[in-house]
A protein has these predicted regions:
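Conserved, function-critical positions that sit in or immediately flank catalytic
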Residues: 167, 171-397
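Tryptophan-rich substrate-binding surfaces of secreted polymer-degrading and adhesive proteins
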Residues: 1-216, 286-290, 337-339, 382-384
């Protein structure tokens, strides 16, 4: 039987990593200073930086030598770690997918042509760094590939999303990225999601989060998708059956075909549902209530947006001599609970570290980053090292 790692397991892994930051000592480190040809450094060949097939090496040999190749590192704190999702910018005259709970190999996202919610373009970030999820995009099963274009930038920040716009879109506000997070984490490929969403006391987060889990919003249905309009129907109202209660819709028809279904009461407590058409004389209609994530939109944005990736911010500058700026690097990594140099079993907890040895030079010689230096140890033993940095003023190698 085949198996695969689910999206929810990946999200759990990202959550677990972030939650472990405060209980452990994690460090972002740089390594593998750029050598000069023809003296490639440890673990490299002379063309390591030019090969078109330059895939990273991941084996126990390299794992054992990270201490030899690392240059310096900086401690990772919870303030410098965020969950991220792929960046989908709102652009006028662009088509977007709507949120659906049932995208799969049997149900394709009509705009992005994918079969997974988290791979589809069902949310956007605006130029004001506000994030919205798309609840409706004007599509139906009658013509699922004809996705209207979004013409009006979402701006409403109410808990209850506004009615459908004339372009067919309906957007639900989730959050706004803070200016401090923009400075640290802004990216062309991803945008960050606020930390500690489930326990935050931030007024804006509390408003959206609690709105997704109130008596009114709890698993409330916001949208019913018309997969098939059928025939022989008349304008009417109908209830939404399932494991929730209180859901009702208003149905509009054209020549006997259902052409509009408006949720007049979303009810609460639904994890599945069907529109009750048993009292109707029509046939062939298929109406799909769209089930919200978790307890409602905005309650758990990590599941709602699929935050299975983590972005780490680490700034290395010349404010400390531990971070020389005249070097280069080809390795970026994360260390967990490194031990101090002098004590076995003692975890290093400082703010930054240097893995480099230093030598004072008393003679005038030409030294370049990447040069190989040797020392005869006697008995045929020769120690080798590579220059990571050289301070021409202090003569410290």
């Amino acid at each position: 039987m085949s198996a695969f790692v689910t999206d929810q397991f990946r999200i759990l892994n990202a959550n677990s990593f972030i939650e472990s930051i405060n209980d452990n000592s994690y460090y972002a480190f740089l390594g593998l200073s750029n050598p000069t040809t023809p003296n490639p450094g440890f673990g490299r060949t002379s063309d390591w930086n030019t090969s078109i097939n330059n895939n990273p090496i991941d084996n126990f040999q390299y794992l054992s030598h990270y201490r030899d190749t690392s240059l310096f590192g900086k401690k990772i704190t919870s303030e410098n770690v965020r969950r991220v999702v792929k960046r989908v910018d709102w652009i006028s005259n662009t088509s977007y997918d709507m949120y659906r709970h049932d995208y799969s190999e049997y149900t394709e996202a009509p705009s992005s042509k994918v079969f997974n919610l988290y791979n589809s373009n069902y949310y956007v970030i605006t130029d004001e760094f506000k994030v919205y999820i798309c609840l409706e995009n004007g599509t139906s099963g009658k013509n699922p590939t004809n996705v209207p274009r979004s013409l009006f930038k979402p701006v409403d920040t109410s808990i209850e999303p506004p009615t459908v716009g004339s372009d067919g879109y309906r957007w639900k506000y989730l959050f706004t990225i803070s200016p401090s997070d923009i400075i640290k984490f802004d990216s062309t490929e991803y945008f960050i999601v606020p930390n500690n969403w489930e326990n935050s006391l931030n007024n804006e987060i509390v408003r959206i989060r609690d709105g997704g889990n109130s008596d009114i919003q709890n698993n409330q249905i916001k949208k019913v998708y018309i997969e098939s309009g059928g025939s022989g129907y008349v304008d009417t109202t109908a209830s939404i059956l399932g494991d929730g209660s209180g859901g009702e819709v208003s149905i509009t028809t054209t020549n006997g075909e259902i052409t509009s279904v408006v949720v007049t009461s979303g009810g609460k407590g639904y994890t599945y549902g069907i529109v009750n058409l048993n009292s109707s004389s029509g046939t062939g209609a298929k109406l799909i209530p769209i089930i919200p994530p978790s307890k409602g939109h905005g309650y758990d944005i990590y599941k709602e947006l699929g935050t299975d990736k983590v972005l780490i911010y680490a700034r290395f500058d010349d404010s400390t001599k531990d971070f020389p700026t005249d070097t280069k690097f080809a390795q970026v990594g994360i260390l967990k609970n490194p031990e101090t140099f002098s004590g076995v079993g003692i975890t290093f907890t400082g703010g930054n570290f240097s893995s480099l040895y230093s030598i004072g030079i008393t003679t005038s010689i030409s030294i370049n980053v990447g040069d190989k230096i040797t020392q005869n140890q006697g008995n045929g033993l020769i120690a080798e090292g590579y220059v990571a940095s050289f301070d021409t003023e202090t003569k410290i190698l």
